[in-house]
């Protein structure tokens, strides 16, 4: 059996020759950025594919999050999860907003709605949940709390491309949803991101903010930044869309194989599927319990020695990093579930090019063979 390196993910790259005509078109257009034709085509194509009304493309998902907060004029305190990539909380700090961490649900690993109300103060202006691993948050419960307290809801939907619940795209919930199109994501544009928004007026404000606040040659309406996606990134996204359904099918096959082959291994708990009608199989997290022969870190090292590079997403918690750990909400006794999960979680390799031999190699290693 092969011993080649297997990483937790690998960017999906369509055949290079299929990308060349897009590049030729860009060269002919002589437009490289500033909302050119590829950018416009991708926005329209994504609205159609995702089933949303309005989407604004960005150069990355973090700038999209930063701009979403600016677009809604969020200030004060925002309730969020400690169990995410650091960009979730960093986007708050960069906007001068105080993140307030709330514990996660032990089954979904998303923000626990039953813990939110106790964290609300007079300074709270919004909730920023994360659809962790692409599993939908309890959007109804979160929205009910937001409505009761007049709070905004901004979803960090970096993992949730293409995910649907019974009513359609999960991205339609809340005031805004921010996506990441980073190379590690299910759908990528090398680097990129987007904000899904409910109406044309909000999209116009977002478009202004991502272009320095410029409206026309003589009018600047806000202190914006440069968050624009280039034509090359947008073109790659258009090509990716032609392949995304096929890529999702392979991800689902890998997910189902893991679930079937690992379900009876003592000490491995598979994170439950989120109840969504359409999943994107972006990650495959497992929890290593006390009755497994190795603890999580020992298994992580064993796999690494075998050239299998799983990842401990998300360890450490955001709340453990120096810029956050002094906050009252970051204290471990406030986040018992998140701390326990962070000490047990391991995300296994999942990507369309992962072949069955390497999949079997991973499973056999987990079985102790």
Label every PLM stretch briefly.
Residues 60, 104, 132, 183, ...:
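Short, conserved catalytic or interaction motifs in soluble domains
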Residues 155-189, 216-221:
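Conserved active-site segment immediately N-terminal to the catalytic lysine
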Residues 31-77, 83, 91-94, 101-103, ...:
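Phosphate-binding glycine-rich loop
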Residues 1-32, 349:
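N-terminal "arm"/small-domain region of PLP-dependent enzymes with the aminotransferase-like
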Residues 70-157, 164:
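PLP-dependent aminotransferase-like
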Residues 172-208, 231-234:
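Active-site PLP attachment segment
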Residues 56, 79, 100, 153-154, ...:
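Structural detector of well-ordered beta-strand residues that form the stable sheet scaffold
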Residues 37-45, 49-53, 114, 118, ...:
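PLP-dependent aminotransferase class I/II
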